[in-house]
Design a protein with these regions (language model features):
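Alpha-helical segment proximal to the catalytic Tyr-Lys
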Residues: 126, 170-174, 232
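Active-site loop immediately N-terminal to the catalytic Tyr-X3-Lys motif
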Residues: 99, 146-152, 174-175, 211, ...
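C-terminal helical subdomain
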Residues: 181, 203-234, 241-243
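Active-site helix of classical SDR
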Residues: 121, 157-160, 165
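Substrate-binding pocket helix/loop in short-chain dehydrogenase/reductase
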Residues: 97-98, 105-110, 192, 200-204
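Residue(s) in the substrate-gating loop at a strand-loop-helix junction
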Residues: 141
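Short C-terminal tail/terminal secondary-structure segment
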Residues: 2, 145-146, 224, 235-248
Length: 248
């Protein structure tokens, strides 16, 4: 394990890609706060060896609740020091075409994917600006670029995350805070594999230049690199981890 790099926060960290990101950041030397709204999934975090070693901290939290975010991130800083890295991975979507998208679903998807990212980033960035260092990685999707079909709200939210990330990089750079975006393609999460047939998965493979579907570890290793000292001169960038589904 690398030298202690301080505290990292990963939203949506109890499952899928988020869980893989937590593993990579722990291996890199971070103590990681695992933020998730799913209490059942979060409870499994407390069963892990890293929890027993004091390297992961489960935090049940809705990222759309600013008051709760300010309270919990403040408590984490008081107990473990200011946040050194934030990964905004939490997200959700609902099945619908553009013509069928309801206002209710639009608002819910935008709230989690875009507003929640904004709230978490702003609260964490205030700590980072004070200490004049930090890194934020926001997770986007190839859906923002029209690569695959899906709800209009999800595509709009992820496009918003990318624009927000660029603005953050410009405004936070003078304070020593780096901001980058990882654009995720089709990834073999447990959620995806449980819902798609072999035929559907094969169709998804055919949309990549590599002829393969990504693994959560592919995303996690990229995020860990961007959070590392090796990436100290990288900010304001969008990194596509999609097998070539989308190329910047």
């Amino acid at each position: 394990m690398s030298d202690n790099r301080g505290l990292a926060v990963v939203t949506g960290g109890a499952r899928g890609i988020g869980e893989a990101i937590v593993d990579e950041l722990v291996a890199a030397g971070y103590r990681v706060a695992v933020v998730d709204v799913n209490a059942k999934a979060l409870a499994k975090t407390a069963e892990r060896e890293a929890f027993r070693a004091g390297l992961v901290i489960p935090v049940e939290l809705s990222i759309t609740d600013r008051t709760a975010v300010e309270r919990e991130l403040g408590a984490l800083a008081a107990s473990h020091g200011a946040i050194q890295a934030l990964v905004n991975n939490a997200g959700m979507t609902l099945p619908a075409t553009f013509l069928d998208q309801t206002d209710e679903d639009w608002n819910r998807i935008i709230a989690v994917n875009l507003t929640g990212t904004f709230i978490m980033a702003q609260v964490a960035a205030r700590q980072m600006v004070e200490q004049r260092s930090g890194v934020i990685v926001n997770i986007s999707s190839v859906s923002a670029h029209g690569v695959r079909t899906g709800p209009a709200a999800y595509a709009a939210a992820k496009a918003g995350v990318e624009g927000l990330s660029r603005l953050m990089a410009v405004q936070l750079g003078p304070f020593g805070v780096r901001v980058n975006t990882v654009v995720v393609g089709t990834t073999a999460t447990p959620w995806l594999l449980s819902r798609k047939s072999d035929e559907e998965l094969e169709t998804m493979r055919s949309t990549t230049l590599t002829g393969s579907i990504g693994e959560p570890a592919d995303i996690a290793k990229t995020v860990a690199f961007l959070c590392s000292p090796s990436a100290k001169h990288i900010t304001g960038q969008m990194v596509s981890v999609s097998g070539g589904q989308w190329m910047p």
